[in-house]
Structures are given as structure tokens and as C-alpha cells.
Amino acid sequence: MSTSQAEHTRVHPRRRPLKTAPPSLSASTSIESCVADSSSSSPNLSLRKGETFHSPSPPPSDDIDPVLSFRSLPQRSPTCTRSLEAIAAREQRMVDYLSNLNLNSLEPSSPLSDKDNGDDLPVPRAILQAHIDSQSMADRVGRPTQSSELHTPSKVRKTHCHASDSGLGTSLSSENMSASDKSKGIFFYLLNLQPHFLFANMLVIVKAGQLSFESQSSAKATTRMTQSAITSSISAFDAKISQKRQLGLPACKQIERLIIKPILREERLKPFHPLVQSIPQRIVDREIGCLRDLEKTLLWLAPVSDFQKRNGVGCIAHSFSRVLKNYAASRASYLRFCEFTIQCLHTSVYHLNERDQRLPADRPYTNGYFLDLVAQIRRYAAMINESRSSMPSNREPAQNGAKASAPKYVVSPPSRWFARFNIVRSEHITLEGGLSKNGRPAELVVHKDGEMISLRTGKPYEENAVPAMKRSLSLGSVDEGVERSMARRKKNAPPMDINQKCKDCDKVFKRPCDLTKHEKTHSRPWKCTEPSCKYHEIGWPTEKERDRHINDKHSKAPALYKCKFAPCTYSSKRESNCKQHMEKAHGWDYVRSKHNGRNSKKASNGATPQTPSIATPSSKAQGITTPLTGSEPSPFEPVTAYPPNPPFSFADPPTQTGSGDFPLFTTNSPFEDLAAGVNDFSPLPTTSLDFQAFQSQLEGADPNGLIPLTFDRQSFDSGSPVPDLINETMGFDTSPVASTDSSSLNFDLAWSQLDAQNVEEEFTTLTMQMLTPEHSVSMSALNSFSRDPSISNPSPLPVQKVENSLYTPDSCHVDEGVSDLFDSGYQHKADFMLFDQHTNFGASSVNMSSTCQLSALHNSNQMFPSLNTPDLNYMTQGWPQDMEMEHF
């Protein structure tokens, strides 16, 4: 083998020489040049199968450059001049592209030609997604009620919803679309707008992350599954892997009964009825998987517009609120809807289990959660109201004198439903400051007319301002009193001099209050109201002295204080003088507010006798004790009572029989009338709900608890199928109850068709109080215990009114020291029974009325045998070994 052949075999595929020159950056890339190059090229050149992965055959030796063909060197150095020029050229092209997009102005940087209005510019994803969502909602409303076969996930494909072309072909030719069709679509309006107008000055709320799935089998009947931005993530949705949980039959019935129907019955909430009518279809499409998803959909989509134009284009929320219809016309209507919805949500919490209420990672429904939700709703309503009131279309352009200034607000491009919007041109927001930049916290700043205004304070932003410190850095400026109050006093420190001297005299006071009182004797701030009086300038140290002076000297009708001892006629203008008179002349006990020691030597002559104690009605009934209140039965359990003169028997206790006692709750509830049909059921009155009282109950209750319902609600009959609540009465077709589509929920399923395990799961996870069934009802699904006493571990005894749980000492695990007190060698045979199994509990209960069964079930270890049947072995029966009867 030659040396040249060995050298060629060691050639790396990525190290092979470059046959053609690199394309020039400034060269023309027109189609004509490409065609010319292809036509002028050699026809012998062809693409071989292994050209990409294998080293080509070596070129002729005449064409090899000895420098470029040196195998140990790369083709081009990273610091090559041509590489640097290519990088600089790319950066220059990017600068040229960005210079054409001015995001802060609506004025075009260069005139647009006709070719710029074509399809070369991609449609913004937000606009395209809103258009797709509107078509999806239109298909939902217009979907036929007939059942359609649910396609398997293998036949479902993703619809191409990207704004740009993939390059692999097109589904619709532009020549096939007429000009009239283009003028009706939303793309005709969007392509007339500037790119910076679309991206910078348009506020769009869309369902981010929504994906559409379309079946290939039928062009008319399509099945769409969407993801909402409120209840789902933005990640891609896989129909096979991530199937969101669907609400079950009981949860859908409760939501329809407690949330959908009450809102649809409210005439004042009529603007929000389209949103509520879309809830059943959202549940079917798995957009709503729990009560928390329903809450977010109702509360956060309430101010969003869903108006359908005549061309079928869905409108976009928040940005066209003055042109199109919105759910919330005002802040008051939105708050009214949210308050009513929150009360319905609070009611439905008691009728749904934890799995249907929220996800495991979500915050549970408590009083604190509802209070936070109310505060968040009101703050959100205030933000929406503020944004709508401060829209550019609501404000007039600024004018300077008689001549208007430069147009601050400009009109959008000539589209009729965009023409009413004025967009602010010169306002933009930036993030200024930072601890690493100027030592101040970062904050948002609005640039408006060359002025910077802080959004945090609303004042002009000063970029070079000195950052404020919490404490002064100068030690000399700190007050001594501040140091003493902020620092803890040292141990064994000498006492501080707290004596303060008066500034006007030489008196020293230990207390600051005494010093303040003394200083008023020098300032005398209380002046007389009479200008001619000398005390008008001198004044009095206290207000009381000033009032007494005016009453004595200047009052025309002074208040006189008369002596209370008749027939004495003494009177004085001063109350203190009258009291001193009664004390000296009549021996009255003058109790002064401040004891000065003058009355301590003499005793009181006219002491007031003590009032004799008078017995109150409650003091005579102290010996009567309050009787103990027994346990009350459940309201849904029939009223029971013991029969008079029951027969005495330990083994056969008296059973309860029905009596004519009054019921605890009325049977005719205003919300329990099911005879007229479920469609007439009105769980929420329109005038009796006071949200302020509801909020007060939440604030006064435990934040981690949940206040009970204020009125009773009756559930559906568990044995009858669910009727159609919405299709005929409410008047919309997208209810899962009325839907006969196989892809929707099966609402014709009755309780009897569910598995027993599912029934127990639904009942054990409920937060509401369980209803006590009657003894005559067979509990085949919930009765998991056996009533056969022959089994070693019998079930608990029937419910009694007293505690009767008896067990042997060896039936539980005890401590090591305590176990020494019992006989370890004793082996008990069986535990004795205190009460007999007489009450019938379903099919598995034991009939204790037969004599033969009593004798068969009799245990030799039983403490008290039955007295109703003769037992020959009764006299010879021995007592149990674990009992010692000392006194019988």
C-alpha cells in the first residue's frame, strides 16, 4: 500500500477539504441567480447515497493545494480574518433589522411597499391563538346534539396552528382565496397594521397553552380538546399520557344544582350567563377537573369578553372593552357576580368530597381562604376599573391655549373596529436602580414626555438621589434619650440623675408631671375672656381656676349650690364652699378626692348605713341541680322512646319503640319540595342573601375552620335518575345533562348501578354530616361487619345510650410492670356478652326470638342466662373463673 493511499484512509469526514468557495454575504440570493447557477453547473454532478456519512474519494493530485491539504491543520483558524468579518456582518444585519422595528413609536421608519403586506410577516401567536379559540368555541355552540363516536387517540392528530410556514408544503393556496374572503378574516386587519403596533401596543388576553386536536375521519364532526391557561399548564398536552381527571356524576349534579342553576336564575347576573352556560362543556372537555378550577374560571373570566362578531372572529379581552361587549359592564356588576358566586362555592364545599374540591397541593377551603378570596376579588375589580377609566380613549388630547399641541395620542391604522382606540405613543416603562447600581432598590419608572415618574411613589424619579439609611451614621447626632430607650441598661450601673430643675425658679422636681404642672404657674396659659379683667393678661394656671373665676366675677346667671339640709338657706357660687358649710354646720361627711389628713382624727358622725342584702330569685334556687341532657337522635332517624313497664331481663334489654314525640326539624322545608319536580327547586333565594353578614361570619370564625350553612338543602333522590335540569328550563344546549354525545358524561347513571366500593369511597370522603338510615333499610354496601357471634372477632354491639365496652385484661397490650398484677397462666375461653343480639340489622343479623336458637347460642361462660326460657343447667352452672363474687 502506498503512502498517499494510507494518508487518504486516515482522513476524518469533518476534516475533508472544501471543494467550493463559501457563499458571499453580499452576493445576491435571487431566484434568477440560483437558476442560472444550477443551469451552468456540470450535469455529471449527482448526490450519492453515502456522501454524507463517508469520506469522499480524494480529488486529483493536480487540484490539491499542499498547504490546504495538510491533514493535521483545520480548514480555518478561529481567529481568521474572514471569520471575524462574517461575525461583524451578521451583527450589522441584526442591527439593520432592529432599526426597522421601533417599539416606542407608531410612525413607520420606512414606507411599506405592497409586497410587505403579504404573508411574509408572521402573525403574532397571541392573535392566532385567540382566533383558534374563537373558532373552537363556535364549534362547541354549533355542535349537533346527536352522539358522535369518540375517536381513539391514535387517530387524533395535532392541527398546525403556527404562524409561519413549515416549508414542507401548504394546505391552502393563496390564489384560491378570494379578496372578499380575505377582507372578512382577522388576518386582513392584522396585516394592515405595523409590526411594532401588534407587539407593543396591543394588550391581549388569550388562553396560552391551548392546543387543538382534530380528527381526520370527518370534516363536519370534530372533537376538540383544549387546555385553559387558568386551570392548566402551558406545556404540551398528550392525550395518551396526561389525561386530566373528569368530575364524577355526584359532583356534576351538585355543581349544577348549587352553582349553575342559582346563577342562571338571577336576572341581575344575566350578562354573565354565557360564561356560566359554558361550564358544563368545559367539564366535559376536562378543562374543569375540580371545584377550584370552576372557581378560577368563573371569577377570573368574568370581566373577559366573549362576543362573537358576524364574521365568526372571536374578540379579544380587555383591549376592546369600549367597542365590544364584556361580561362585566362595571365594577359593581362584577363584584355582585363574584359575591354571589363565592356564596355558592361555600355552599357546594359541604356537598363535595376532597378530591372533587381541589388538587392535593392546593390550599383547602377554609374561612381564611374565602376572606382572602374576597379581598383578592375586590382588588382585582379595582385594578380593572382603574385600567378602564385611564384608557386613552377616555381622555382628551392635551391642548396648549387655543392651539392644540402635538398629537399625544394617535389613531390606529384604518380598520373600523380598531379606529376608536388611541394608543399612547411616548410612554414606556423601564426598570431603574438596583443595589449594585446606585445603592437603591430597583423600581419601575414610567418615561412620559421626557420625565421619569416612579410607579412606587408616583413622584418624579431621581436617579442620583442619595439612598436613605434607617439609622444615622453620625454618632454625635443621636439623642441621649434615644440611646437610653433603645439600649438595655447595664447591670450595677450608678443611678441616673432624673431630677429636673425649673427654668424660671430654683425648684427641683423628681417627676416630669410635677415639673409640667409647676411650669404652668409661670406661664399661666388660661386667660379670662373679659378684656377689662386683669386676668385677661395674667391668666390662670389651670382651666378649672379660670372657669371658677368667670362664674364668680363675670357670669350674669351664675350657678348656685344650695345646702341640702332643710330648712337651711345657705347657697354659694362654689361647690367646695357649700360642701364645707354642710360639713361644719350639719356634720356631713365631706369625702375629698385627695386625702390631705385633716379628717383622719375625727370619726364620721353621720355614716351612711349599709343596705341590707335582698335575696334575688336566683339565690333561692341554689340547691336545685340542672338535670343532665341525654343524647339526642339524628333528625333523619325516627323518634324512639322506651315502652312503659318493660319486662326485667339482663340478657334481653327493653327495645325502643316509636312514639308521638314532636320532631326536632320540620319536614316541610321551603327547599325540600320535590313533588313539583327538581326544576322548581330554588336553593338560593334572590333577596335573602346578605354578603356583609356572610363576610362578618367568616371574620368572626376560626380562620382554619369552615362556618356551617345557614339554611338546609335537600339532595336529589338517590334512587331515581337525574332529570334534565338545563336543556329545557335554562335554554342552552351545551349542558352535560342534556348532551347525548358519547364523549360527554353519562348523566343517566343511577346510584344502584355504581359499585359498592365506589359508594363507600364517595361517602367516606364527604365533609358533610352523614345521614343516619333507618333500621329497616338494608345496608348491603356499607355493612362490612358480621353479626354472627360465633366469629372470634365480632363487630361492635348496636348503638346504646351508655358506654358498655367491656374487655378482659389480656385483650390489650399493657406495660411490663402492670402485667405482673394479672395471672399470666389464666387462659380465658371467651368474653361474656352483656346485651343480647336482639335488634335486627339487615340480612346478616341473627334472629334471637327462637328458643332453640337461644339454647344453641348459650355459652357456658355467659354471666346471665336468659330468664324467658327454662334452662335445666342453670342451677349447676359455675361462675366464670375471672370473677370473685364476695358479696352477692
UniProtKB/Swiss-Prot annotation:
- Cite the InterPro entries for this sequence: Znf_C2H2_type
Its domain of life?
Answer: Eukaryota
Q: Where is the composition biased (Polar residues)?
A: 23-32, 167-176, 388-397, 602-632
Disulfide cross-links? none
The stated induction of this gene product is: Expression is increased by itraconazole treatment.
Q: Where the protein is mainly located, per its record?
A: nucleus
Keyword presence, tRNA-binding: no
Q: Keyword annotations for this protein? A: Metal-binding, Nucleus, Repeat, Transcription, Transcription regulation, Zinc, Zinc-finger
One MF term from GO for this chain?
Answer: zinc ion binding
C2H2-type ZnF: 500-522, 561-586
Where does it localize?
A: Nucleus
Q: Which PROSITE patterns does this chain map to?
A: ZINC_FINGER_C2H2_1 (PS00028), ZINC_FINGER_C2H2_2 (PS50157)
Q: Which GO terms describe its cellular component?
A: nucleus
According to its UniProt entry, what is the function of this protein? Transcription factor that contributes to azole resistance by coregulating the expression of the drug target erg11A and the drug efflux pump mdr1. Binds to the 5'-AGGCA-3' motif in the promoters of ergosterol biosynthesis and drug pump genes to regulate their expression. Is able to interact with the promoters of sltA, sltB, erg11A, erg13A, erg24A, mdr1, abcE and mfsC. Involved in antifungal drug resistance to azoles, terbinafine, and simvastatin but not amphotericin B or caspofungin.
What domain comment accompanies this record? The C2H2 DNA-binding domain and the C terminus (residues 596 to 888) are essential for the functions in itraconazole resistance.
Please give the name of this protein.
C2H2 zinc finger transcription factor sltA
Which organism was this protein described from? Aspergillus fumigatus (strain CBS 144.89 / FGSC A1163 / CEA10) (Neosartorya fumigata)
**Which lineage ranks, top first, belong to the organism behind this chain?**
Eukaryota, Fungi, Dikarya, Ascomycota, Pezizomycotina
